[in-house]
Amino acid sequence: MRVYAAFVVALVSLLATNSAVLAVTTPTKLAKLTAPEFTDNENRQRRLLRKQEGAELGDEERTSTQNLGNSLMRVFSKEATRKYYLDLFKRADFTANLPKLAKKGGPDRLNDALKKLRKAGISEEKFAELKGAAAKYADDWYRIYGKLDPIRA
């Protein structure tokens, strides 16, 4: 009889626990957790925390970190433009790439690249070398694609 009473008490407590869990997780209460207002409030709180963390920095520290980030961006972007335009000259060295470069602007493209490389801060020796390569490329390009080649004419 005691075993039976313990069994009934266990079932009743299990039933009470399940009903309490079900009462907490009703669809309406779950919907409140996924409602846009809840997520908006959560996002607003996160933004507020980020602002407070940023406010802990002084004005000088904040501007110095911004200036550091800006200068790093300038360094990396200069390096990226320099690399891109130097690659143009590497591609122009191969005669197999002449038709591809001709479709994309011909000698003017390399002359524009020279201007941008000069702004990016390339050395004078390298600039003179690349200028000679651009002139040679322009001669070849005008000879072949300007119908001045005696073989093609």
UniProtKB/Swiss-Prot annotation:
A motif (RxLR-dEER) lies at residues 47-62. Keywords: Host cytoplasm, Host nucleus, Secreted, Signal. Residues 1-23 form the signal peptide. One of its GO terms (cellular component) is host cell nucleolus. It comes from the Eukaryota. Induction: Expression is induced during host plant infection. Its main location: secreted. It is found in: Secreted; Host nucleus, Host nucleolus; Host nucleus; Host cytoplasm. Secreted effector that does not produce a statistically significant enhancement of P.infestans colonization of Nicotiana benthamiana leaves. Belongs to the RxLR effector family. The RxLR-dEER motif acts to carry the protein into the host cell cytoplasm through binding to cell surface phosphatidylinositol-3-phosphate. This is RxLR effector protein Avr-vnt11. It comes from Phytophthora infestans (strain T30-4).
